[in-house]
Amino acid sequence: HVLVAGETGSGKSVILRCLLWQMIEQGARVYMIDFKGGVEFGKQYEQYGEVITERERALQVLDLLVKENEYRLHVFRDLEVKNLDEYNKKTRQNLCRIGVFTDELAEMLDKKGVAKEEKQIYEQIEGKLSTLARLSRATGINLFMGVQRPDANVLTGQIKNNIPVRISGRFADKTASEIVLGNTDAVNLPDIKGRFLYKVGNETIEFQSFYFDDETMLHEVCVDQGEMLTEAPVYKVPEHKIPVRKNENKKAEVVRSGRKEKKVTAVKTSGEEKNSYEDPFVGMNSREIEEEMRRMDEEDLNLNFGDF
């Protein structure tokens, strides 16, 4: 997980987009949460991932990702692997990373001035983010969060304490620097756009961030051995496979019907239904999933993940 903090004009959004493009180039699935109506992640980003502008949809996606994280943890335990890299090496399944990007965390979590009846959804979003921050690093579901005015109302302890990588631009306020870095070093940064401090563990490094414009990167991002990406699927759900546990106590049954709807039901030995959900990709390898998603490009997939 990564936290990027900086005042207006510091270059915070550019760093986040740089990280976003790196994730895209490495084959990750990305979600971009932008409650400014898509100003930071405009229409050109929609071909690479879902741009979320509504709070209700953000909560829905975060809930799906929490369930996906539970699924991955379940599979990792069964296979006795510790993280996504070990899983992919052991199974050769190439389970993809998932990145959740938000340019301004305060828009999601700051409840100041919010009507009492609206606070519930803020608290639900905060709860989902806290769960992912605590549990999803090893499973390859990564949070990339930007914040302009860090304070305790936005960066709660549950979230902040589980973000190992912190990047901060210059702050005039010592308190803001303390919240992000745990020290006041950001106050002494030169007032140069793109100048940041990078902290991992106890080490803090000053650096000048890379600058690029969106138009350049849109032309640079390529797929399939250099072929330019002109049309790409809008990924709206995480890629996953169904865990099948082979032991004396549990069995699993897979029932497939149709190309776009496949019913998957896990059952106990007694035949009692444990959970079920719709998954159009069960049984496919990563290449088949990619081809299927291209055929289903721009269709609104609304899949429910079982709770393992």
What is the role of each PLM region?
Residues 84-85, 285:
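Flexible coil/linker segments and helix-coil junctions enriched in charged and small residues
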Residues 1-82, 92-181, 186-190, 259, ...:
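P-loop NTPase catalytic phosphate-binding loop
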Residues 87-89:
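Short, charged, amphipathic alpha-helical segments
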Residues 51, 139, 145-233, 237, ...:
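Conserved ATP-driven motor cores of ASCE-family P-loop NTPases powering translocation/secretion/packaging/pilus
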